[in-house]
């Protein structure tokens, strides 16, 4: 089993972190033991409200996933060092090439 959550977790998290947690918990019920959720989203600035920029901090996503009971692994595959995280993801200068985290959330066996 696999589910992909692509660049949407911030939309659940920023207005209400509990809403994002509930989404992950609901997705978890759809997975067999050992099933995975792939999560990618735009990296935000630590200690800042990232909602206007449509971003979130990587650690926020990891904390949510662990709180939902997933085993979490991360990858640097989608990192983009030219993105300074201070612009909206819709800023034309970024050309949608944002710095993104990539997480593998696995439902325990």
Model feature map: region roles:
Residues 1-18:
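A short SAM/SAH-binding and catalytic strip from SAM-dependent methyltransferases
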Residues 14-21, 52-59, 95-96:
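Soluble non-cytosolic domains of exported or imported proteins
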Residues 23, 66, 71-77, 96, ...:
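Mature catalytic domains of secreted/periplasmic carbohydrate-active enzymes
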Residues 34-43:
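Conserved beta-strand signature within the Rossmann-like core of class I S-adenosyl-L-methionine
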Residues 49-75:
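Conserved Class I S-adenosyl-L-methionine
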């Amino acid at each position: 089993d696999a589910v992909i959550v692509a660049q949407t977790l911030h939309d659940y998290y920023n207005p209400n972190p509990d809403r994002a947690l509930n989404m992950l918990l609901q997705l978890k019920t759809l997975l067999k033991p050992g099933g995975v959720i792939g999560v990618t989203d735009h990296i935000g600035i630590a200690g800042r409200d990232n909602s206007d920029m449509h971003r979130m901090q990587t650690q926020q996503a990891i904390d949510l996933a662990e709180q939902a009971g997933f085993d979490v692994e991360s990858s640097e595959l989608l990192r983009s060092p030219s993105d300074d995280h201070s612009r909206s993801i819709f800023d034309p200068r970024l050309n949608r090439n944002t710095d993104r985290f990539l997480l593998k959330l696995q439902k325990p066996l």
